[in-house]
Amino acid sequence: MEYVKSIIDRYKHLRSLRQLGEGYRGMYAFVGIGNHSTSNLYPVLSYLHVPLKYIGCKSHDKLPLIERAYPGVKATTSLAEILSDDEVKGVFVSIAPEAHFDIGIKVLESGKALFVEKPPCRNAQQLMQLADARKKAGNPTVVVGLQKRMSPAMQLLKKELARCSEPMTYNLRYLTGAYPEGDALLD
């Protein structure tokens, strides 16, 4: 178990060095202030030091509460205000799924990068509209929130699978404990 702990510690150290060396070239906005956002996404953005300029929501009475909870961030109910700000390079969207497409297409039409929780749209026609909007805007980065797909384990697996010349199968299990601080084998 000591060996596993040393690997985890080494990984955390290297990850920390990499993250501190990387900087962001602009500000970002976040649309949505629901439970998933506040419990899962905002802590990750804080940990990664992603500079947020705006938090957008649909409720005027939440604006002062948001600004108190997130100092230095402007709370707004205006998506147009966010999208017209040239300093904002990308927008994170985590709202009701039925609104993902409408907000996502506006973000892409503004030329900004988009992170949107799944599902990004409801049907193939909307998906094609998103793809077309992305092309027209110069191909800004688009990421759909499929957490497991972005995990370090999956990135390593993709590299290994790319070297294979024959079809293969694999069985992948995710640990759901307090990794990396917990017991990586038993949690």
Can you name each region flagged by the protein language model?
Residues 47-48, 70, 85-86, 137, ...:
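Acidic-histidine catalytic/liganding microenvironments
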Residues 54, 74, 89-90, 141, ...:
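Short, Asp-centered acidic motifs that coordinate Mg2+ and/or phosphate
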Residues 70-115, 119-133:
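Beta-loop-alpha module in the N-terminal Rossmann-like domain of NAD(P)-dependent dehydrogenases
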Residues 98, 121-182:
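A contiguous active-site-proximal alpha/beta segment in oxidoreductase catalytic domains
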Residues 2-70:
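N-terminal Rossmann-like dinucleotide-binding module
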Residues 186:
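Anionic-ligand binding region
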Residues 51, 113, 141:
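Residue-level detector of anion-binding/catalytic polar loops
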Residues 31-32, 56, 94, 145, ...:
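Short hydrophobic segments within beta-strands
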